Amino acid sequence: PLPFSPPSTPVSPPSTPVSPPSTPVSPPSTPVSPPSTPVSPPSTPVSPPSTPVSPPSTPVSPPSTPVSPPSTPVSPPSTPVSPPSTPVSPPSTPVSPPSTPVSPPSSPAPGAVGGVNSSLSQRSTSEHWHASVSVQFERWRDRTPASGLRFAPLAEGWAILTAASCNLHNIRQRPGSSAADRRHCTRSTRSSRRMSRRHRHKGGLRGFVSRCRRSGCCRFSSFASPTIRSKLTGYGVADVGCGVLFVLRHTARRILARS
């Protein structure tokens, strides 16, 4: 048992050299503080560039003045709106498409359409026309519920739809018409009947009109009666055939169905 006692003593001295390396850790903490000082001076040059921002705000005010004069030419076309209030005599009889084609009328002058002065700008003309037509159609829809007219508001204007079908007689008797044209015209007829509740399908009414015109099945057919057709046409309504009358916002670009 005596030789085991001496090796217990050399274990204690190596515990002492552990304490001194703890001291050199403190000095490196001091040099961290000085670099915090140079951060403050660069904050000063930020303030001067804020001053030149104010002067460019002044030239914005003068261009606001020339905007007012173009609003004046809208007032003169308000006078020809009064006569269209009379045509409220649509017949209550059901619509029946004619068996004979009606020849398309000559296209109106591009400047004056619906009694609007040609000197007015395109924008003022379209705005005035859209406002007056909306009022007239609201009156017709309220006062003549049994006329067979159905109205559908669209982004391009107003569409007047009837229960009349496309006049397929013209296509079947036209030389050179193919079976594909006849099938397309039949499909277009079904589309026109659904257009009042599905006027967004496949490009809306404008897309339907363009497809129908490309196929050649849309001719200028009569609508309800010649009296109503002439009155509506006087308001800038374009009869595109297949039982569809289309009102454009820009009356200078009226659609007249031609083969």
UniProtKB/Swiss-Prot annotation:
<feature type="repeat" description="12">
    <location>
        <begin position="82"/>
        <end position="88"/>
    </location>
</feature>
<feature type="repeat" description="15">
    <location>
        <begin position="103"/>
        <end position="109"/>
    </location>
</feature>
<feature type="repeat" description="4">
    <location>
        <begin position="26"/>
        <end position="32"/>
    </location>
</feature>
<feature type="repeat" description="7">
    <location>
        <begin position="47"/>
        <end position="53"/>
    </location>
</feature>
<feature type="repeat" description="13">
    <location>
        <begin position="89"/>
        <end position="95"/>
    </location>
</feature>
<feature type="repeat" description="8">
    <location>
        <begin position="54"/>
        <end position="60"/>
    </location>
</feature>
<feature type="region of interest" description="Disordered">
    <location>
        <begin position="1"/>
        <end position="127"/>
    </location>
</feature>
<feature type="repeat" description="2">
    <location>
        <begin position="12"/>
        <end position="18"/>
    </location>
</feature>
<keyword id="KW-0677">Repeat</keyword>
<protein>
    <recommendedName>
        <fullName>Merozoite surface protein CMZ-8</fullName>
    </recommendedName>
</protein>
<feature type="repeat" description="6">
    <location>
        <begin position="40"/>
        <end position="46"/>
    </location>
</feature>
<feature type="region of interest" description="15 X 7 AA repeats of S-P-P-S-T-P-V">
    <location>
        <begin position="5"/>
        <end position="109"/>
    </location>
</feature>
<feature type="repeat" description="1">
    <location>
        <begin position="5"/>
        <end position="11"/>
    </location>
</feature>
<feature type="repeat" description="10">
    <location>
        <begin position="68"/>
        <end position="74"/>
    </location>
</feature>
<feature type="repeat" description="5">
    <location>
        <begin position="33"/>
        <end position="39"/>
    </location>
</feature>
<feature type="repeat" description="11">
    <location>
        <begin position="75"/>
        <end position="81"/>
    </location>
</feature>
<feature type="region of interest" description="Disordered">
    <location>
        <begin position="174"/>
        <end position="203"/>
    </location>
</feature>
<feature type="repeat" description="14">
    <location>
        <begin position="96"/>
        <end position="102"/>
    </location>
</feature>
<feature type="repeat" description="9">
    <location>
        <begin position="61"/>
        <end position="67"/>
    </location>
</feature>
<feature type="compositionally biased region" description="Pro residues">
    <location>
        <begin position="1"/>
        <end position="108"/>
    </location>
</feature>
<feature type="repeat" description="3">
    <location>
        <begin position="19"/>
        <end position="25"/>
    </location>
</feature>
<keyword id="KW-0477">Merozoite</keyword>
<feature type="compositionally biased region" description="Basic residues">
    <location>
        <begin position="184"/>
        <end position="203"/>
    </location>
</feature>
